[in-house]
Structure formats: C-alpha cells, structure tokens
C-alpha cells in the first residue's frame, strides 16, 4: 500500500483482476489507521490482504507491531512468527486472542515462536485460523519442501496432531487464500496422495 491511494484505486485494481494485496507495511503506508481504511476498501472489492508482522525485512520496511496489526485488521496476520525477527511471544498471544483473522506461521520464521503460536491457537480453540506458508523467496532463500518441513516441525515439536498440521497446510490455507485445491470437495481441483501411518 502506498500513501495517497483512494477507494477508486482498489475498484480499478479489482476490475483489472487483482485479488491479493502485497504485504501491508512494506510500502509507504505503515500506520494502523491509514492501513485499516485501505484494507477495508480492498475487502469491499474482493481483494484479500496480508499484513507484515514483526521487524523490518526489506529496505524501506519497518517494525509492524501488534497494535498496528490489530488496527489494520488485514485478512491474514502474515508470518506471525516473524521473518526470523518475531514479535515478543506475549504480543503474538495478544494477536491470537484479540483478532479473528487468519494466523500465518511460516517456515522462514522463528521456529520457537511458530511452535508456541500453534500451541496457543489450539488452546484458544482457533486452529481453524492457522495457515502455513514459507515466506520465500526471501532473504533466507527458497527452502525445498518448506511446507512439508513446517508440517513436520509442528507435528513433532508443537504438540499438533499430524493430521491437523496437514489441514493447516492444505484446507485452512486454501480456504483463506481462495484456492481451488486443498480440500476434498466436488468440483475442486485435486491431487491424490496415498499415505500410510509411520512404521515404528
């Protein structure tokens, strides 16, 4: 988002086929109230939004703290576990508790905060809001099988049942991102993966 954008800009973007905003907070708009107005316009025209969460990442970015995230009210709390520089855990807990929006845990983030976030979301009975991403390509590169590695991390160290961690990566993410996959439903695009339980 850039300063000076008005409602008609979002209408024009939607008419041109734009359906996703880049991360709120990486452009010139960083204040919560200003971002909230633009996020509302985007939502009005069917454009989904994600907000940067945590410390600066690219040149021109800055700290986006819990208060800005809550005020902006984007559809997805992007990389809640940071791009390695996560918010303090008590702030992550506040975001889980005070927002009703999707919570994105990423592979290229702080692993400890990612694990704790998944546990906290389960305690709050809001695991349906957890989605997974890689946050790549980023400064830490592109991780092959990053989503699978994140599923394994949450299932092994996060006390998340494996089938639930897979749901974060597939159905939850598809629902929040508006993807035509990730759920087994009539009319959806599907790949079939046959799995067996681990042998011990």
How should each PLM-predicted stretch be described?
Residues 1-5:
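Metal-cofactor-binding active-site regions of metalloenzymes
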Residues 6, 35, 62, 89, ...:
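Generic non-transmembrane alpha-helix signal with a bias for helix starts/N-cap capping motifs
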Residues 10, 39, 66, 93, ...:
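Short glycine-/small-residue-rich flexible loop motifs, especially phosphate/cofactor-binding loops
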Residues 13:
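Phosphate/diphosphate-binding glycine-rich loops and adjacent basic-rich segments that engage nucleotide
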Residues 16:
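Active-site charged/polar residues at nucleotide-handling catalytic sites that mediate phosphoryl
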Residues 20-141, 158:
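Active-site core of metal-dependent hydrolases
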Residues 119-197:
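His/Asp/Glu-enriched, well-ordered alpha-helical/loop segment
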């Amino acid at each position: 988002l850039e300063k000076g954008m008005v409602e008609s800009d979002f209408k024009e973007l939607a008419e041109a086929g734009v359906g996703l905003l880049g991360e709120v907070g990486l452009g010139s708009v960083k204040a919560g109230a200003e971002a909230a107005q633009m996020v509302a316009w985007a939502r009005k025209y069917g454009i989904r939004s994600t907000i940067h969460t945590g410390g600066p990442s690219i040149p021109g970015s800055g700290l986006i703290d819990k208060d800005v995230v809550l005020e902006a009210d984007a559809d997805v709390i992007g990389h809640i576990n940071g791009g390695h520089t996560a918010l303090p855990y008590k702030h992550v807990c506040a975001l889980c508790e005070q927002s009703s929006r999707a919570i994105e845990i990423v592979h290229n983030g702080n692993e400890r905060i990612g694990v704790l976030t998944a546990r906290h979301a389960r305690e709050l009975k809001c695991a349906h809001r957890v989605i997974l991403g890689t946050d790549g390509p980023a400064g830490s590169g592109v991780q092959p099988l990053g989503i699978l590695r994140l599923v394994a991390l949450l299932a092994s160290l996060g006390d998340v049942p494996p089938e639930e961690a897979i749901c974060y990566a597939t159905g939850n993410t598809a629902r929040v991102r508006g993807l035509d996959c990730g759920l087994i439903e009539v009319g959806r695009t599907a790949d079939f993966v046959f799995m067996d339980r681990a042998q011990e």
